[in-house]
Each structure stands twice: as C-alpha cells, then as structure tokens.
Amino acid sequence: MSIESIQFTLRERFAAPLPEFYQRRIIFWQDEDREFESMLDELYIPDVTILKLTGTNNFAVKKLLLHDDLTGNYLIYNPFSYADPKDNWLLDIEKFSEEYRSDLISTRMNELNIEASPAMRKTVKLYAKFFDSKERIERLKRIGREYHTPLQLHIDIMAVLAGLNGGSAQDVFIAVLSAGQGEENNAVLSNIKKFGNIDAFWQLVRKYTGYIHEDEKALVLFAAHVLLTALAQTMNPSVLKGLERFISDSNKAYCYSIVHEWRNREDNGALWELCRSVEQELHLASRFEKQDIETLLTADIFPSIHEVILSRFFSEIADHVVKTELMLKTAENRRTSGWIERFENYYDCLYYVAKMQNFYQENAAGFHIVEPKAIWKLYTEKAYEMDSFYRHFHYAFGCTLKNSNVLLEDKLKHAADYVEGLYQNWFLKELTGCWTKAISDNLAALGYVSEIGKQRDFYSHYVKPLAGKNSRAFVIISDALRYEVAAELCDTITRTTKGTAKLDAVQAVFPSITKFGMAALLPGRKLSVNDGMDVLVDEMPTRSTDERGKILCAANMNSVAVQYTDVLNMKRAERRELVSGKEVVYIYHNTIDAIGDKAPTEKKVFDACEDAMQELSNILRIVINDMQGT
C-alpha cells in the first residue's frame, strides 16, 4: 500500500466526527511486521501528532496521553506485539482508542471476520499459501464464521482443503481417513501439506484423538489408533491387552464419536475397508474368538465381532446345541450395534431359530390331542407361530444369499439343516399326524369336520350380513395366503390404521386347491365338477373373474368382481365408478400363489409373502381412500 493511500485513509479517519462524549481521537497503527516503518517520516496529517513506540518510551507515551495532553489528536505507530497482554503498558488506552492496519494480512483478517489479535495474526501467517487462492478464500468466507481463537480457524481452513463446506475437526479427520491410507496418494492430506500446515493438522489430531504422529505409516497408525481407542469405549480392557500403544484412554469417547458419525453416513464404505484392514493387520478376529459371547455383546466398531458371534452360534446350532435365551438376548442386543445393516438378516435367522427352539421345548412331548376343535384352537391361537418363525427364518436366510458373507454362508447353511429337521421332521410330522388321526371319523362320516366353520359358508356368514342399502362389503381374496401370514397382516392393520381387525379361520373344502377354494367363497347352493374337471356353482362356471362376477350378481345384482392388478392400474375416478351403487365387491389377489405354484419360483414364496402383505395393505388404503370403504 502506498504512502499516499495510507495518508488519505488516515486523514479521513481523523476528519470524521467524534463519537459521543469523545473530545479527541487516538488511533493506534498496528504494524508488527514493520512493513511501513520507513514511511512514517513522510506522513503528514493536519492537527495530528505522530508518535512511534520504541519499546523504551511506552511509559512516557502513557504519561503524555493520560496526563500531559488530554485534548490533542494522536497517531501512535506500534511495531510490537505481545504474547501476554499484561506486557502491553498501553493496553488500557488501546481499549478506548481506534485501531488502524494497512497490511494485506490485516485486510484479509478483517474481510474474513478474524479477530485482530496477535494470536490470530500469527495463525493467518501460517497459511500464506492457502490465502494465495481467491477460490479458497471465498470458500472459507462462505462458511460464515467469526474467528476468535486459532483452533476454529485451523479447522475451517483444513475443512476447505478437504473439500468440505465447514464442519468440525471430526469431519476433517473423516475426510483424511476416507481418502486412503497411503500418504502419497491421499489427496486431502496432500492438500493440507501443500496449501495448509501439516504440523497444525497433526497437532489437531493429537489434541482430539491422542494420537502422536509418527513418520512411518502415519495414516495407517492413525486409523488403527482411532478404531482401537473407539473400541476400548465398549470393550473390557483385558481383551485389548498388548494393544495399549493404539489406545488413548482420555480420548475414547471422542474416537468413538468419530466412528459412530462416519458409520452412520451413506458413504461409509471407506470406513468398512479401514476396519477390515486393521482387523487383518492386528489379527483381531482371533483375539475376539477367545472371548465368551457376553464379553462381545456390547462391543462395537469392527465387523469381525459380528462374524465371531454369529459363527459360534451357527456352529453350535448345526451341532444341535441351541442356547435359546442367549441367542434371543444377542439378537436383540446387537440390533443397535455398528454395521448391523450388513448382518441384520443373519441376526434375524438367529432370532427365529431361537423362537422355533423355544416352541419345540414347550411342546417336546408332541401333540396328544384327540378333539379336532382343540387342535384347531391350539393352531389358531399358538401353534401357527411355528409356521411364522419358519417363514421369517427362510426370508432372512434368502436375504443373506443375495449378498453373502464368506465366513458365515456355510455355517448358516448347516444351521438351516437343523431348522429343516425341526420343522419338517418334528412340527409338521407331529401336528399333521395328530390332526389326521383326530378328524378321520368326521371325514369318513360327514366329509368335513364338525363344530368348525366351513369355507363353503363364507358368503352367507361373512358377506351377506354386511351387504345392504347403507353398506358395502369389500372382499379381498388372496390366494395361498397362509393363516400365519394373515395373523401378521391383522396385527399390521391394527397398528397402522384407525380401524380394527379381527382374525378368523374356517376349514377349506376338499381338495384344498385354488379352483375349489375360489368357488367355495362364492354364493350358491350347489358346488359340482363337470367332466372337464371345471368347478361349477349352481351349474355356472367359476374359472374367470367375469364368471365369478356373474355368480355374485345372481345372489346380489349390485355386485362386481375385479382383479387386484386392474384396480391398481385404475385412476381414482375409475375406482369410484367401479364401486358406484355396488353392495358387494370381490377383489382377487394372486401374488403368493403365482410364485409358489411353479417349480422354478417356489423358493421365492417367502419373498412373495412379504410382497403380498405390502400389496394387501396398499389395496386396503385404496378401498378406504378411493372406494369409500369403511
């Protein structure tokens, strides 16, 4: 800056009106780097006395300003800075005076809302290369912070160099560790070295995480330090004996927060790879394998903890050792642990094996019931849960196969063999045998089981009483929907809607295949079969939706039958028009049967059950919102 420019600015400052209650103006020209000391003799400002501090005249200047001359205007040139404000004899006068700076650093500090203190000025000087770029300055400015301490300025400058829009030291550390473990190829660390201050970075690292920088493998060791210090927050110290060099006790909570924050981000793939690398380098899995399950339950951070826990349980299950209480406790406990999204389906498998085993233990003696109605009650109130546990196990098992874990895949498959034995060879065998024996006399004499509602009475018992001038009966028929799936859907409807749901069961017609079951749900007096094995109701065919609609209309002319997919594709106005004036609406849904009825896709039936429940919940919303269902 030229002497002319400085002189012009200072003359303007002194010519400006004085603040209220002030009789004169004193301005301290701060120039710690003595950039403008040589220009001082050329400076002339009318009616202003210019004084230069020499380091030995401070007391004399103070006496002059506070005693000898209380009315004169003064420009005090100060080329000194003080590490300790107590050393500044003129600090009290500076407090009620004005400040002027003419150097680039001061201009920059003012522009970026950086406090004009010696400590902040020193910090700005550290980043000369950073401030060479207008783009970097603009990005720092956009953070919009006021800087009163060097710490926050260090952090924000490094955040800019890491490609962030501000943040915390934690965000900077995550950005550095995400960029790779090799210092030469780590773009973020290279930026900090080139345009920032690498020493300041490692000082920040030490302050927050406790890691002391080492020249060899600095990033690798930093990563290991953060992860193991975080692990120490949730694991018994005895497990980590021999790894003390990687752990800072006073920084455990902070390191844990780094990992927790990073892991909860969508882009946590680099953390996963980092954990895997450290696990392998320090042989952590073998260390965890020596611990009991209770010790590992609360431990977090490393994926191998999940693998050790699950591997042990699956191996035990395959050997017919099923610790139900511990398995249930583990499955529930681990649902909130880190990396659960990658292991959730495995824990679901564990959970449902335990639930199946519990049911088995409660009924290990078998089912010795002779009354059909009592067996019916047992199944509809309790035993159906075994079917539900089995389905949920296989659904979770199928999900694991879509993105399998090499260490767990075979162990889970061996555990699945135990599940099949428990379900097929015990549950189905025992319950089916009991049921078959109990109903044999009824079937021989009547062709059905007495004292249990019949599918053939569905229309007269459930539909007809609801259909009338002031009400409309909606019937959603989902082919091959098992009772246990319906029970879960009933709970879902109760939980997610304002209405109420009730679950009931009736015995199917024989044979219990689709074309007979669909016909049995229609009104009419007589069910028969022609020579072509077509099922008829009162001599009318029942194969197609239109044919079923005609049978419905024969019983109530204000009826309609439609497929779920057709309703789904209709516009809202079309849906309203479809049911206008109707008292009975049959909607046919076929997701499960369409999958399970064909050999190539029958293994997908467990997925189809999940889809079916979502679709049935959806059609229920459509009925309520678009078809005036209540």
Task: Name every feature range the model reports, one short phrase each.
Residues V475:
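Hydrophobic "anchor" residues on beta-strands that sit immediately upstream
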Residues M1-R472, R482-G629:
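…; additionally, a secondary subgroup of soluble metalloenzymes is captured
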Residues D479:
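Ligand-binding pocket scaffold of soluble enzyme catalytic domains
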